[in-house]
């Protein structure tokens, strides 16, 4: 740069511009620097010329000549000069100069006027403000120009970055990272997967399926065996239908080898329609299934890393540990990890709200609605059959159709959340119309697929059960719970594996309850048949032992050898023997059914006083029915499914729409869930009909508190379509669900509803808690808290056992104790010692039917128990006073 520029920079900034390189190596381009300097010089020259001409025109004539040639120099080094305050090392010499000219003249131009320091003050006084502005502006051209190229927009290093796509769940940045995720360490990959969960419902479903499938190897083996089972059934059916000459097999007695009845090149003789078309469709479906298995394989690999590395659980441990332990480790992982920067899950509340209750609600979001609909009889699935009467026709096939027609319509397939338009009352007519169309469409599809699928299921069930019935004929009379019973007996937020375990435990008690009913006529007939068949089998076996070679091929009837009759009569003997009840069984159906209710959690009020009748037994047998009957109903259901889907269920479309709209509540961090799954007991008896809705998640992510925001929920009784069907509140469905949920998981984080639960239990006995503090929650919970502290086993509210059996009728001591022991809630959460104390306390507090004279003798036990739990005794006394009144 020019010397003038150097002097200016040195006086103002104390630096030497000759030694400064303002070249920017990041953006510089040597090929364009000269061109850039030329353009910049022309730009500033033009700007200065325009400005200078304007300045000259605006000045007076007297000042134009003075300003035309101006040169100021300071040689004095006066302390008053601000430039003299600078370090002397920054100056080129002992003198400092201010050079200005309005042309590009050199500094030694003799025409410049030199102004000495002593005259500078005088000359400066003659300059007005515009002169100073002109002076400052004229120095602008002397400032050194920075040599760099202005980069274009696409040249920026960060130009490849795209803003995150909020609406797209995948996101551009996340997708680019996901392509490189396989290069990460397994632990880092597992952490990345956990931190970038965008759909928590789907993720928890995958976690639960991995747990119930017992690990990676077991799940993949099951998937391939199921696929090969379908392939084998189709191949076997095709081969037997096309490649065997049945005419020769049945009529030709000279046939002894399979090759004699096998048709060569049998598949080349079949036509395109319908067999080859069916085979091509099956092949396409097989390819799609293989692709789905491949996608599942990728997900299972990630789940394996998640369980093995993050949760510290190997696949072998998954077969023995409880689900509660998995939930606890997920909660620990939740507390120790946060979302990654690239995660699109901005709802941090959903990650914080992840306790056992929230996890169950996410996994069973759809199932909770179905449990409520079946318990409230929203779906009309009954048909009238001649000579049989009304039959409840819910099969596994019908459940698949309901999931497609109803659940897939109300829930979003990607997020798993309920579709918001379905909750708008103004859309009621539209939703009902669309729901009817979907149901009718499913019915039409069933009409088209009925012939093919009926044949498939016949083959499947035949191959599945024939060998079992042949090797163990007693299984032909075995029973299991029907699909309708499984929905009826299932609790809210009860995971499938917990529910199956509960039903499996109840199987033995169910068989004992049914078999103890006297059936003398049938028993006598079965004993006679068993004796005849057993005698013939015994004779044939003895003769066969004497001469095995002759009698094994000896034909008793044309075409029927001894071996055939031994096998057939042996099966008949086994069936009759297992159908005869055990002689040691004691007939006491009431005690048996109450004991059974510990596991089924099902004891309807209309059964009260009729436990010994055939009516109650038949009602229970509709739930726990013959397995052979269920198989036949599953096969024949293809004849009735179109009728149910096209005519019966469309009439329920309005009710289904109203149910989803009026029994859905929104929970922050959780989304819309079924009202009954939130265990809101304190709003069951609200006269205004308001249901408390949890809006703000707490720190523990627990169950909603009573202080949550309220939303209007209608009376649930409007959905009860049968007069004999009790309302869900009277049946204590939610209470039993909540109690069993606490028993399954523990209530470390779910204690907020205990107060509302006890209040609801008091209300259910029609006792008004208005007499002071003797019915407060602390007294009711007194014994429960003491049991937790002493035994370490969590004992849930004992008040439920007291109130549940507090019926106004005469009871003996044995009956009262039986009522307490058989209570479906109390007996599952209380040990036998506490049940015995509870029964005695229940009896010894003035209940009807007791001799008052006998009470003082037993008061010792009562006082001893009262000292242990005064709150419970006060509650018992309160109940007694109500009964006496």
UniProtKB/Swiss-Prot annotation:
One of its GO terms (cellular component) is Golgi membrane. Keywords: Autophagy, Cytoplasmic vesicle, Endoplasmic reticulum, Golgi apparatus, Lipid transport, Membrane, Phosphoprotein, Transmembrane, Transmembrane helix, Transport, Vacuole. Residues 1-223, 301-438, 460-524, 577-625, 647-885 are cytoplasmic. Pfam families: ATG9. Residues 49-108, 688-726, 847-871 are annotated as: Disordered. The keyword S-adenosyl-L-methionine does not apply. One of its GO terms (biological process) is reticulophagy. Residues 439-459, 626-646 dip into the membrane without crossing it. It catalyses: a 1,2-diacyl-sn-glycero-3-phosphocholine(in) = a 1,2-diacyl-sn-glycero-3-phosphocholine(out); a 1,2-diacyl-sn-glycero-3-phospho-L-serine(in) = a 1,2-diacyl-sn-glycero-3-phospho-L-serine(out); a 1,2-diacyl-sn-glycero-3-phosphoethanolamine(in) = a 1,2-diacyl-sn-glycero-3-phosphoethanolamine(out); a 1,2-diacyl-sn-glycero-3-phospho-(1D-myo-inositol-3-phosphate)(in) = a 1,2-diacyl-sn-glycero-3-phospho-(1D-myo-inositol-3-phosphate)(out). Phospholipid scramblase involved in autophagy and cytoplasm to vacuole transport (Cvt) vesicle formation. Cycles between the preautophagosomal structure/phagophore assembly site (PAS) and the cytoplasmic vesicle pool and supplies membrane for the growing autophagosome. Lipid scramblase activity plays a key role in preautophagosomal structure/phagophore assembly by distributing the phospholipids that arrive through ATG2 from the cytoplasmic to the luminal leaflet of the bilayer, thereby driving autophagosomal membrane expansion. Required for mitophagy. This is Autophagy-related protein 9.
């Amino acid at each position: 740069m020019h010397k003038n520029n150097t002097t200016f920079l040195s006086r103002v900034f104390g630096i030497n511009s000759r030694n400064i390189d303002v070249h920017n190596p990041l953006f510089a381009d040597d090929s364009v620097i000269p061109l850039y300097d030329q353009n910049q010089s022309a730009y500033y020259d033009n700007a200065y010329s325009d400005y200078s001409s304007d300045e000259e025109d605006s000045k007076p004539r007297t000042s134009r000549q003075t300003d035309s040639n101006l040169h100021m120099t300071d040689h004095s080094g006066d302390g008053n000069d601000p430039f003299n305050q600078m370090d002397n090392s920054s100056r080129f010499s002992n003198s400092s100069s201010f050079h200005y000219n309005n042309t590009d003249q050199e500094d030694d131009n003799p025409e410049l006027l030199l102004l000495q320091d002593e005259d500078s003050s005088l000359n400066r006084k003659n300059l007005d403000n515009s002169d100073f502005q002109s002076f400052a502006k004229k120095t602008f051209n002397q400032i050194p120009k920075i040599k760099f190229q202005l980069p274009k927009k696409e040249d920026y290093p960060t130009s490849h970055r795209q803003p995150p796509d909020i609406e797209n769940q995948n996101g551009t940045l996340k997708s680019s990272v996901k392509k490189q995720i396989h290069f990460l360490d397994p632990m880092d990959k597992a952490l990345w997967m956990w931190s970038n969960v965008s759909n928590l419902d789907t993720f928890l479903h995958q976690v639960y399926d991995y747990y119930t499938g017992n690990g990676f190897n077991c799940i993949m083996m099951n998937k391939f065996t199921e696929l090969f089972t379908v392939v084998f059934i189709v191949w076997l059916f095709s081969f037997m239908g096309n490649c065997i000459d049945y005419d020769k097999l049945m009529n030709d007695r000279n046939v002894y080898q399979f090759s004699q009845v096998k048709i060569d090149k049998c598949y080349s003789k079949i036509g395109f329609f319908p067999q080859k078309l069916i085979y091509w469709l099956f092949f396409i479906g097989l390819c799609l299934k293989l692709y789905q298995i491949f996608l599942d394989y990728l997900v299972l690999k990630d789940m394996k890393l998640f369980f093995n590395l993050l949760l510290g659980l190997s696949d072998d441990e998954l077969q023995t540990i409880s689900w509660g332990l998995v939930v606890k480790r997920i909660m620990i992982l939740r507390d120790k990890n946060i979302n990654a920067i690239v995660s699109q899950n901005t709802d941090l509340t959903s990650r914080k709200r992840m306790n056992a209750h929230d996890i169950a609600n996410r996994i069973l979001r759809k199932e909770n609605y179905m449990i409520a609909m079946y318990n409230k009889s929203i779906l009309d699935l009954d048909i009238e059959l001649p000579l049989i009467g009304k039959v409840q026709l819910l099969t596994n096939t019908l459940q698949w159709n309901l999931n497609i027609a109803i659940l897939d319509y109300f829930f979003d397939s990607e997020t798993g959340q309920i579709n918001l338009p379905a909750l708008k009352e103004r859309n009621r007519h539209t939703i009902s119309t669309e729901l009817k169309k979907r149901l009718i469409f499913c019915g039409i599809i069933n009409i088209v697929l009925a012939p093919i699928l009926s044949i498939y299921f016949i083959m499947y069930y035949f191959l599945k059960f024939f060998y079992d019935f042949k090797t163990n004929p007693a299984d032909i009379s075995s029973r299991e719970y029907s699909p309708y019973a499984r929905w009826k007996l299932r609790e809210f937020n009860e995971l499938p594996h917990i529910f199956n375990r509960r039903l499996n435990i109840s199987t033995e008690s169910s068989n004992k309850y049914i078999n103890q009913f006297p059936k003398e006529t049938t028993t006598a007939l079965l004993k006679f048949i068993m004796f005849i068949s057993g005698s013939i089998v015994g004779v044939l076996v003895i003769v066969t032992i004497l001469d095995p070679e002759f009698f094994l091929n000896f034909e008793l009837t044309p075409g029927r050898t001894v071996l055939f009759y031994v096998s057939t009569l042996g099966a008949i003997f086994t069936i009759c023997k297992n159908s005869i009840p055990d002689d040691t069984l004691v007939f006491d159906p009431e005690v048996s059914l109450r004991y059974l209710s510990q596991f089924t959690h099902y004891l309807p009020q209309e059964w009260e006083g009729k436990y010994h009748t055939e009516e109650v037994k038949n009602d229970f047998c509709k739930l726990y029915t013959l397995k052979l009957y269920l198989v036949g109903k599953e096969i024949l259901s293809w004849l009735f499914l179109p009728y149910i889907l096209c005519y019966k269920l469309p009439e329920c479309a309005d009710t289904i729409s109203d149910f989803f709209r009026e029994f859905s509540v929104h929970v922050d961090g959780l989304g819309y869930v079924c009202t009954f799954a939130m265990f809101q007991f304190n709003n069951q008896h609200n006269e205004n009909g308001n249901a408390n809705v949890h809006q703000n998640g707490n720190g523990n992510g627990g169950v909603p508190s009573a202080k949550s925001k309220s939303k209007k929920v209608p009376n649930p009784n409007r959905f009860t379509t049968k007069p004999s069907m009790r309302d869900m509140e009277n049946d204590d469905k939610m209470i039993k669900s909540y109690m069993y949920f606490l028993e399954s998981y523990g209530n470390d984080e779910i204690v907020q509803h205990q107060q509302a639960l006890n209040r609801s239990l008091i209300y259910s006995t029609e006792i008004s808690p208005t007499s002071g503090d003797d019915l407060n929650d602390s007294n009711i919970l007194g014994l429960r808290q003491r049991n937790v502290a002493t035994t370490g086993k969590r004992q849930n509210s004992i008040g439920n056992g007291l109130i549940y059996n507090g019926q106004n009728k005469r009871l003996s001591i044995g009956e009262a104790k039986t009522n307490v022991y058989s209570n479906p809630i109390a007996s599952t959460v209380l040990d036998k010692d506490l049940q015995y104390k509870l029964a005695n306390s229940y009896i010894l507090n003035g209940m009807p039917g007791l001799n008052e004279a006998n009470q003082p003798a037993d008061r010792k036990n009562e006082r001893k128990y009262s000292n242990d739990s005064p709150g419970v005794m006060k509650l018992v006394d309160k109940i007694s006073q109500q009964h006496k009144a």
